[in-house]
């Protein structure tokens, strides 16, 4: 991004926390950034930048757009937290020029909850894939089957179900291995080290170019709990790799069932294993 001429401004954010003090700090940080750089337009991504960035733009009278890349776990539950998020989204979305969605179900949820005027809603069907960068790759001929996971290693990505399914395969003496790419949440550091020693997982950290790993993979796996539109599914499909992914909006669109891949139940390691 820097090579393209972009200016990078780091904004510390607690992605999963609900501490009001921390979130107010983020809001005022956004306000100060807007005051300093005076942008013509702001495009916000993900829940906290959408909400607090949107509110900061309203306060500073800056034009802005929201991009809903997924609704997160809070939208799948009932209770005070969901009600609060819906209320904040309504405030943040009120003056937005447009609200982009990456799948129809997320847009439908916003319509049902009447978060903003429907005239603002635009469906993108994902961020898209550069098919010259992710072109068809010959299928590997290795005897050992390589499953591939790319993403943040966290509970909501379905990694617990994935690890359970892989352990079951490995216990049956199947000749397979799971290649894992991405940063991990603190809870998973010890687990990853343990599974590597057991021999069925290889952790490669964050990779700026995933193509060598996609080329080696026999199958891409993403058992996520929720997604906007999973680009890693699209990139793997564009490269000619079968996919196993969750039967949820944002994942299932990338698969023709039993032809280009398989769909599994969300939060179900047995379904994933089968």
Tell where the protein language model's regions lie, with residue ranges.
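Short, structured helix-loop element that forms part of the nucleotide-activated donor/catalytic region
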Residues: 1-4, 108, 168-171, 177-204
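Donor nucleotide-sugar binding/catalytic pocket of nucleotide-sugar-dependent glycosyltransferases
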Residues: 9-10, 90-136
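Nucleotide-sugar donor phosphate/pyrophosphate-binding loop at the beta->alpha transition
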Residues: 21-28, 63-65, 73-95
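Short His-centered aromatic/hydrophobic patch
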Residues: 44-50, 68
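Conserved donor-binding/catalytic core segment of Leloir-type glycosyltransferases
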Residues: 138-157, 162-167
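Aromatic "clamp/platform" in nucleotide-sugar-dependent glycosyltransferases that forms part
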Residues: 206, 225
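Short hydrophobic beta-strand element within catalytic cores of glycosyltransferases
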Residues: 242-245, 255
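Conserved acidic donor-binding segment of nucleotide-sugar-dependent glycosyltransferases
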Residues: 257-258, 262-269
